[in-house]
Regions:
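Formylglycine-dependent sulfatase
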Residues: 2-3, 18-251
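Sec-dependent signal peptide recognition
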Residues: 1-9
Length: 251
């Protein structure tokens, strides 16, 4: 009986120790990324060895569903765990803190900080635009570089002819520039630098990459991975947009 009591206390002690050990959390958000990633099997030709390797080491949610096709409502939903139908946020505005019913909502990083003692970091695109990045917002303890689609072709030159006025957001292609000049490079560089500094644990770091958000510009080496004569294009249903509102064409 004494042994059973000792064993029970030992198991309880071990379980409490395990509960006290809080994991560091690195959350990577990729804007407009679909399932064309190797480990998700969305396209037979895609080459994504780095993210495939990362998925094996971490946690990959393979049955997660986007709450909205727009940035602001979708990101708000993710960070406060409420659907657009309950927040009333369906467009690129408003910032949820400006909605009276939501202004005091506790977000994911704030919950971790308050209840888990986490130090919170953020860089890139986590909320839409500048939301959550002002010093007065107090959404994160440490904030790194913001999101950017730059650089763009000189003089805002359009690389392809597109319907409805050659809008820059539906442009795509390559032009002379370096990967190191891209906003996402700066974001990744900052995040790696923070991790190399061995931050105080536990920590929550959210890293939001802008690409593959439109416009779809990349350096030539990425196009060279997919020669035109070998590329398998996705099947497109003829007239697929005929029964959809024009606004949805840009989603």
């Amino acid at each position: 009986m004494q042994f059973l009591r000792f064993l029970s206390l030992l198991l309880l002690s071990l379980s409490l120790q395990a509960a006290d050990k809080k994991p560091n959390i690195l959350m990577i958000a990729i804007d407009d990324q679909n399932d064309w990633i190797g480990y998700l099997g969305g396209h037979p030709m895609v080459k994504t060895p780095h993210i495939d390797r990362l998925a094996k080491r971490g946690t990959a949610f393979t049955n997660a569903h986007c709450q909205s096709p727009l940035c602001n409502p979708s990101r708000t939903s993710l960070m406060i765990s409420r659907r657009p139908g309950s927040t009333g946020i369906y467009g690129l505005a408003p910032w949820f803190r400006n909605v009276p019913e939501l202004k005091d909502t506790v977000t994911l990083p704030q919950y971790l900080k308050k209840h888990g003692g986490y130090k919170t970091y953020s860089t890139g695109k986590i909320y839409h635009g500048r939301y959550g990045r002002q010093k007065t917002d107090k959404e994160f303890d440490v904030i790194g570089p913001g999101a950017s689609g730059k650089p763009f072709p000189k003089g805002n030159k359009k690389l392809v002819t597109t319907p409805f006025g050659n809008h820059r957001l539906v442009d795509w292609g390559t032009f002379p520039h370096k990967d190191e000049e891209k906003g996402d490079w700066l974001i990744a560089d900052w995040a790696v630098d923070q991790l190399n500094k061995k931050p105080k644990e536990p920590f929550f770091m959210s890293v939001g990459f802008f690409l593959p958000h439109v416009p779809l510009f990349a350096t030539q080496k990425w196009f060279d991975l997919y020669p035109d004569n070998d590329t398998v294009l996705p099947k497109i249903k003829r007239g697929d947009r005929d029964d959809t509102p024009r606004f949805s064409w840009y989603m």
